[in-house]
Amino acid sequence: MSTASRSELRLPNLLIRNPNFVLLWAAYGISALGDHLSEMALFQTAGGFDRPDSTRVQALMTFCFFLPFVVLGPLAGWWADRFSRKWTMIAADLIRCTIMGSLPFSVPWLFGLRLGDFAVGLPLAAAGMFAAFFSPARQAMVPTLIRDDQLVRANAMISALGTIGAILSAVIGGYLVDLSKAGYIHLDWNYRLDALSFVLSAVLLAGIVRRGGSRSRVVPHEIAAGVWTPLREGFAYVRRHRRVLQIILLGTVFWAAAGIVISVIPGIVRDIFGGQYSDAGMYRGLIAAGLATGAALLTLVGPALPTPLGVLIALLGGGLWVWALDAALLLKLGRLFSGVCLFMIGVHGAGILVNVMVIIQHFVPDARRGRVFGVSDMSTMAAIVIATGLLGLPDIKHLDHYIPWLLGVTGAGLLLALAFAWREYRRGNPFSATVWLIWQIVRLYAGFWCRVRRSGACTVPRTGPVILAANHTSGVDPLVILGTCTHRVVSFIVERQYYDAPLAGWFMRLARCIPVDRENPGRSFLANSLRLLKEGGCLGIFPQGTYVPADEPEPEAKSGVGALALRTGAMVIPCHISGTRYAYSPFVSLFRRHRVRVRYGKPVDLSAFRGRARDKDAPQEASGAIMAAIRALGMETDGRDA
């Protein structure tokens, strides 16, 4: 076992018991809590709802904050690979604290220079410069503090807490602005609380300690020498790795859409919700609430959700809900429906955000991770900068009148991204679109509901005739195999009564399953099995033919699997399944939660049976050898889990 693997085993199973992760998690949440406090105050200082172009003001502020991510993203990524990520984040927090704390003096001074609306944009640009260094350092540090199988949950937890902070920040920021307008407090309290949040974040980050259990001490870390060569390597890595490039492009589309939706919220709030600053914070907070909810759902599902399925659902839902928001604005459908639309946009946006981070963290080596995140930040933030720049830089009169058109184009852009993602995920896939999509759903079911965990690699070859033989424990066994053998469709031998059922039969015919009448098998079953193997298919079979409760003796293997193996010469791959809960009805077993363990083995050696084609005992003996190989896998699984 490698040093990195041994270190990973020492990390806690529960993320909340990992002190380093909890400190990073809490620091990000607290800093997010202060983010919109200053933004709402600056928006009011620039004129806010009293202007007919509130969309332009919001877009300009968003543009100024994210522009440094585009300009400095690759450099910040190089910095995260070259210098301490922890101290980079602490320094970024303390500098942003200084910037926010000085706003009561700097904003009036900038207005005195006759900078117009840029007087509220420049302080945000200054804060964005150091946020651009904070982001790749944080994202690159996460995998060094946790196990690989915790990436989805960790990123979802970080996203959820960050968006909860954003919800409270937007609501509190708007409420404080309303109080300041009423004369109860001074507007400067928005800036002071924002500065305080960065101080608290820095204190928490300072508590992160690199001990023996931290993977960052044991994973070889190549120091990125120089500046320009490492920067070029970051771009080259993204260009060479198609999966990383694709997910960054999808993140780019999401952030362009997010920039437009965030920019139009003040106009929507004024026209539909009455024009209060607290309303603006609350309804903008609904997007953040949706992001938090989506992240919480991903935390619950964890790695069970296949990335392609998650991305497709996020793009489809995002596009449709943006159009629904457009319809709410045009048809005056009211506050409740509009709020639901904003919330659901956030829910589906979480799917994109978390998947972007997880894929980069999972596939990119630690020594290059910061630079790749820098490229990702540059690309995704370029999208939001371009989108908001087109709205905020030109002085478009009565821009708010064009909000329905902006939302319509945004929804169409997300659906076009959906079509692109579908084409890329389907590229080179030998299965029909229906089979592929159902397979993704089966993988989600097996991973989440059955809590399946595969021990070792799947040994089923990608091509050629194969008999996949497994012990039979429950009605979910076929779905468990389909969920863990992700590169081949397994065609199972199934009972005729299930094959003839309306919905189940349709699914079985798609997978080319072979029906058999248990009372009267007939020759058609054998002929269809031989034909499938002759065509190079993968035949799934349960040698025992049935399953029984755990307290009853395990059935012995029947001769059918041995006869097929000897007659066709197909490779036989053993598979052992454990951890299912017994139910007499296969239908009932689908709704019971399991904790399944699956192990695939090496091909079964049946060379001892060559030349015994006429021996009537050979099929039964071969079946016994196959069943023995399956049981041996069970002993290996029990030993490793002990």
Briefly describe each language-model feature range.
Residues T434-L437, I441, S524-A642:
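Non-catalytic C-terminal accessory region of glycerolipid acyltransferases
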Residues V57-C64, V71, L75, R82, ...:
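C-terminal transmembrane bundle of multi-pass solute transporters/carriers
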